[in-house]
């Protein structure tokens, strides 16, 4: 099932590569590119490195049609599937395999040194990733194999909790909380809140309003002196229950004013700057 979920990814593509038929290795000193016919390559085409799972594939394909010429599966690098030559960094020896399991060793070379560097680094990065994945899988297996710590309560096991300094009185009962509609407790108003007093209605009389007393009219309406006397006289202050004044005293006061006015000879009215109210 895991093999079916694996997909093939492309690691490197080089458009120009040469293939050489190499002679058998005579000793363990390694391959040498100088022993090959470098000026007469046996095949030229395109190189493509792909990966599927942990295995990398070096594919030699035709430049135009993309037809597969040879394929070299690589399970480990560096290893027997890909080897470097002793006298150059642009040439390698790879082991190709067909569908029947037969294998052969051929030499490949790049005209550009940068292409050879990319070929080498692509294989190194892939197998570095494979190594990291292997280590992660081993760690996960070790974690699964360890006995798990059981922190659950056993059957019938109880615990006792001590919460702060809270002590309950003997024989006392807890006070029920006041709850509002729907069983929700009501919170007190916030401190410093202002209480708005509604304004008084129009039907309520204002106690501070005082009706001014009427000004008594004088018998001599045309006389300016009477007007001045009326202005100089203090206004009566209303009380809660004014006592009626004796009639004789009022008549004596007005009699004095009458006597004074009768003793003054009649004179023609003079213009005054006062405005008559």
Swiss-Prot record:
Chief location of this protein within or outside the cell: membrane
Subcellular location per the Swiss-Prot or TrEMBL entry: Cytoplasmic vesicle, Clathrin-coated vesicle membrane; Cell membrane
Cellular component, GO annotation: clathrin vesicle coat; clathrin-coated pit; plasma membrane; presynapse
Gene Ontology terms: biological process: endocytosis; presynaptic endocytosis; protein transport; vesicle-mediated transport
InterPro entries attached to this UniProt entry: NECAP_PHear, PH-like_dom_sf
Keyword Membrane: yes
Region (Disordered): 164-277
Keyword Cell wall biogenesis/degradation recorded: no
Residue ranges, compositional bias (Pro residues): 187-201, 235-245
Polar residues biased stretches: 258-277
Biased composition (Low complexity): 222-234
Signal peptide start-end: none
Keywords on record: Cell membrane, Cytoplasmic vesicle, Endocytosis, Membrane, Phosphoprotein, Protein transport, Repeat, Transport
Modified sites of kind Phosphothreonine: 211
Residue interval(s) of motif WXXF motif 1: 254-257
Organ and tissue specificity: Expressed predominantly in brain (at protein level).
PANTHER family (alphabetical): ADAPTIN EAR-BINDING COAT-ASSOCIATED PROTEIN 1, ATP-BINDING CASSETTE ABC TRANSPORTER-RELATED
Family: Belongs to the NECAP family.
Function as written in the Swiss-Prot or TrEMBL entry: Involved in endocytosis.
Subunit structure: Interacts with AP1G1 and AP2A1 components of the adapter protein complexes AP-1 and AP-2. Interacts with the GAE domain proteins GGA1, GGA2 and GGA3. Interacts with AP2A2.
Domain-level remarks: The WXXF motifs mediate binding of accessory proteins to the ear-domain of AP-1, GGAs and AP-2 through hydrophobic interactions. Selective binding to the GAE domains of AP-1 or to the alpha-ear domain of AP-2 is tuned by the acidic context surrounding the motif and the properties of the second residue of the motif itself. The WXXF motif 1, which is preceded by an acidic residue and has a glycine in second position mediates specific interaction with AP-1. The WXXF motif 2, which is followed by the C-terminal carboxyl group negative charge, allows specific interaction with AP-2.
Name of protein: Adaptin ear-binding coat-associated protein 1
Species per Swiss-Prot/TrEMBL record: Rattus norvegicus
């Amino acid at each position: 099932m895991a093999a079916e979920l694996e997909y093939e990814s492309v690691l490197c593509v080089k458009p120009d590569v040469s293939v050489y038929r190499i002679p058998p290795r005579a000793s363990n000193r390694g391959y040498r590119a100088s022993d090959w016919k470098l000026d007469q390559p046996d095949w030229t085409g395109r190189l493509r490195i792909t990966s599927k799972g942990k295995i990398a594939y070096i594919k030699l394909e035709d430049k135009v049609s993309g037809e597969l010429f040879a394929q070299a599966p690589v399970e480990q690098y560096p290893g027997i599937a890909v080897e470097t030559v002793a006298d150059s960094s642009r040439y390698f020896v790879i082991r190709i395999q067909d569908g029947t399991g037969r294998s052969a060793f051929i030499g490949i070379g790049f005209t550009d040194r940068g292409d050879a560097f990319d070929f080498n680094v692509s294989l190194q990065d892939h197998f570095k990733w494979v190594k990291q994945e292997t280590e992660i899988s081993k760690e996960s297996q070790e974690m699964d194999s360890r006995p798990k710590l059981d922190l659950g309560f056993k059957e019938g096991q109880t615990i006792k909790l001590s919460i702060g300094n809270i002590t309950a009185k003997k024989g006392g009962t807890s006070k029920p909380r006041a709850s509002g509609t729907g069983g929700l407790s009501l919170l007190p108003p916030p401190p410093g809140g202002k209480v708005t007093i509604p304004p008084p209605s129009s039907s309520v009389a204002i106690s501070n309003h005082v009706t001014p007393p009427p000004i008594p009219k004088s018998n001599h309406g045309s006389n300016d002196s009477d007007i001045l006397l009326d202005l100089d006289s203090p206004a009566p202050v209303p009380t809660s229950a004014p006592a009626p004044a004796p009639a004789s005293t009022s008549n004596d006061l007005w009699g004095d004013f009458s006597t004074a006015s009768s003793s003054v000879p009649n004179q023609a009215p003079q213009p005054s700057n006062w405005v008559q109210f």
